[in-house]
Amino acid sequence: MSAEITRPTVADAVALLHVPAPDRLTDRQRAGSACVFSGIPLTTTGAIDLGPRATTNRHGDPVSWYPRAHRGEIPRAALAALHEHAPGCEPCRDEATLDDCPTGSALRRLMREYR
């Protein structure tokens, strides 16, 4: 009996993207009406929800926020996350074993699906 490898969904992969801290963003970026990466104004068709993110407010209380990005910025953000991840990941450093890493596979999938 062989073990089945579970591959991350696109939503799982999007959650791997590194989002700037809310205090470094404009009000429009924090509100989801502008891309968190570039500041591009977002439309319903061009926006990608990046999933809930946890942070703290100025009083230290935990809060969630819901960043969004322009779909054209996803490949660049995925590549940046992959460059941060890959040096410390043995499967990602060897072309023969690239697909053995779920994180690396998910980030490469994002780059393909949103190019």
Task: Please annotate each region the language model reported.
Residues 1-29, 87-115:
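Short, intrinsically disordered terminal segments enriched in charged and Pro/Gly residues
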Residues 30-64:
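Short recognition patches in nucleic-acid-associated and regulatory proteins
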Residues 35, 79-89:
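Disulfide-bonded cysteine-rich modules in secreted/extracellular proteins
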Residues 38-40, 73, 92, 104:
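Short Cys/His-rich metal-coordination motifs, predominantly Zn2+-binding knuckles/fingers
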Residues 43-47, 79, 98, 110:
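Short, non-ligating residues that shape and space the ligands of small metal-coordination modules
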Residues 64-73:
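Zinc-coordinating Cys/His ligand positions in small cysteine/histidine-rich zinc-finger domains
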